Amino acid sequence: MANGSGLSVTELAGSVGFILAVLVEVGAVLGNGTLLVVVLRTPDLQDAFYLAHLCVVDLLAAASIMPLGLLAAPPGLGTVPLDPSSCRAARFLSAALLPACTLGVAALGLARYRLIVHPLRPGARPAPALVLTAVWSAAALLGALSLLGPPPAPPPAPARCSVLAGGLGPFRPLWAMLAFALPALLLLAAYGSIFLVARRAALRPPRGTRPRSDSLDSRLSFLPPLRPRLLGGKAALAPALAVGQFAACWLPYGCACLAPAARAAAAEATVTWVAYSAFAAHPFLYGLLQRPVRLALGRLTRRALPRAPKACTSQAWHLQTLLRRLQELRKDPVLGPSEAPEQARELARQTPSVSEAT
């Protein structure tokens, strides 16, 4: 009985995990696809190049390593076994796309730091193509480390096709430091500097003071507020969310890379899908929370929705309008001498009826 109950609990946990993983997959595809369309249709966004790159990386991950995590046999969530060549391909994709995502997030944070802190120094900002070329070069090198790891086990044994379960061999600590520790430090430095600049601007006193009247409202405005206002609170929201999301999604995966392979393999499915949830969180964190992106999305949505036909409003003809029209007809040279009096008489007959209606 206990064995059956334990089996049912395990099956229930597996089913719930599979449903949550499917929701993460669907959210990553829909969110990044929508944000990519908005960015491509609105090229005047300041960080459009980095946003589009992040969406492309997330969509690549949602089309490659996330379905493998859903369908592949344990340590994945499915039951489809992978042959050695597919196992090596899965290792390479995981080892390359995860650093491309984390380094892309760090590049986006640094770009926003330069736009906010140094807005009038465009020469201090490197070209986005150069930055993203460096990101993909580093991701390709980190992906190549997976090819230097131990070969996959033969088919009778369970194939370990991930970075956590021995896929990198002795290179796992180096991969974790470059894929997670370095982007985390860059992101923390960028958003920390943004927060300090915003807080310093909030603490700065106003340049000029306006003359106040001697009214009661003016005197009451000198009173301190009942609740102390936290200076820089709104400016701290975006950095806190960005750093918090990065730490919540990627810190468990990075710590598992530094743990022994046996302990990392035990928590591989949970830690992997917590990291994959970042692909679904990026469109909301770096898209919908940004006011220019929200405005562009609303504008495109209004254009896409069908517009209701405008109702035809009946125009009421008043007496002054009829008289003005009568004068225009008298002055119109196109009308002949016989046509103008006839139309004048017809308009004159309509005038009493309109005046009675008014």
Swiss-Prot record:
This is G-protein coupled receptor 62. Belongs to the G-protein coupled receptor 1 family. Disruption phenotype: Deficient mice show any abnormality in growth and behavior. Both male and female are fertile. The keyword Ion transport does not apply. Orphan G-protein coupled receptor. Constitutively activates the G(q/11)/inositol phosphate and the G(s)-alpha/cAMP signaling pathways. Has spontaneous activity for beta-arrestin recruitment. Shows a reciprocal regulatory interaction with the melatonin receptor MTNR1B most likely through receptor heteromerization. The gene is Gpr62. One of its GO terms (molecular function) is arrestin family protein binding. Its main location: membrane. GO terms for cellular component: endosome; endosome membrane; plasma membrane; receptor complex. Glycans are attached at residue 3. The chain crosses the membrane at residues 18-38, 54-74, 90-110, 129-149, 177-197, 235-255, 269-289. One of its GO terms (biological process) is adenylate cyclase-activating G protein-coupled receptor signaling pathway. It comes from the Eukaryota. Lacks the conserved DRY and BBXXB motifs. The restoration of these motifs affects its constitutive activity. Homodimer. Forms heterodimer with MTNR1B. Interacts with ARRB1 and ARRB2 in a spontaneous and agonist-independent manner; leading to the internalization of GPR62 in the endosomal compartment.
